[in-house]
Regions:
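Non-catalytic cap/lid and distal C-terminal segments of serine-dependent acyl enzymes
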Residues: 1-250
Length: 250
């Protein structure tokens, strides 16, 4: 498996950001680590083994990045308005700086002149971020695999709400999205999977709410609820990835 390490200065964040790229060709996948995670977690938690059939066959290239959750979602003692602005700077880093890098990389590696959408993938809080990117920017992300996420920003902000927190809280902005909003047509041209178990440490409430909202709005989304033995942990996420990938890549 080809692995590359990159470090770029982010103007949005005012600091260096690191990432690893796994694979030599194929569709781009953006992996967002779990809460407070780092770019090497895809490898450190052995997702390289789980994704290997698709990476080594040239079907996907996985871009694994850093979070800044320790400054934002986890930084409960800091000013919530500052934390929200800082999180939005991370979103700007992804959409304005990282996405062009991903686009250039996959086009060069595949000999493409066009640009396919990116799959957003994450587990736990990484799933929260992945789903938010998918729903906020359907022009950039055409698929999502979100495992064991929470789809409200209330988790990180404990009831504080402003415009920035709102636009990072899918159950809030999707519930208020007009039925004729152009994003809905885009969602329905894409493929999305939201999965959660019902075992230890899982929180299902916002997944059920997200499913309800998407049904009301006519948004196509595969929401899959697994059993009471399915825990919020890596062994189950390793089982879920190969179950859903054939659908998402088909």
């Amino acid at each position: 498996m080809e692995i590359q390490y990159h470090k770029h200065f982010s103007h949005a964040l005012g600091r260096d950001m690191e990432c690893k790229v796994y694979g030599h060709a194929g569709r781009p996948v953006l992996f967002i680590p779990c809460q407070d995670g780092h770019y090497n977690d895809f490898e450190g938690f052995h997702m390289t083994d789980t994704w290997a059939p698709w990476i080594e066959s040239g079907q996907v290239m996985v871009f694994s990045i850093d979070t800044i959750d320790s400054e934002t979602w986890s930084n409960k003692g800091a000013d919530p308005q500052w934390r929200a602005r800082r999180h939005e700077q991370w979103i700007d880093y992804i959409t304005c700086e990282l996405v062009p890098f991903i686009r250039d990389t996959v086009n060069f590696r595949n000999g493409w002149s066009g640009y396919p959408g990116i799959m957003a993938f994450g587990c736990s809080l990484g799933a929260t971020h992945a789903a938010n990117l998918y729903f906020r920017r359907p022009d950039l992300f055409d698929s999502v695999l979100a495992l064991s996420g929470i789809y409200t920003a209330e988790y990180g902000w404990d009831g504080y709400m402003d415009g920035i927190v709102y636009q990072n809280s899918p159950v809030h902005y999707l519930a208020n999205m007009p039925a004729d909003h152009p994003f809905i047509h885009q969602y329905n041209q894409h493929k999305g999977v939201i999965c959660v178990g019902q075992g230890a440490w899982e929180q299902t409430g916002t997944t059920f709410r997200l499913r309800e909202i998407c049904q009301e709005k006519g948004i196509n989304l595969w929401v899959d609820i697994w059993g009471y033995d399915v825990n919020h942990d890596w062994p189950w996420w390793h089982k879920q990835v190969p179950y859903f990938l054939p659908y998402l890549l088909g």
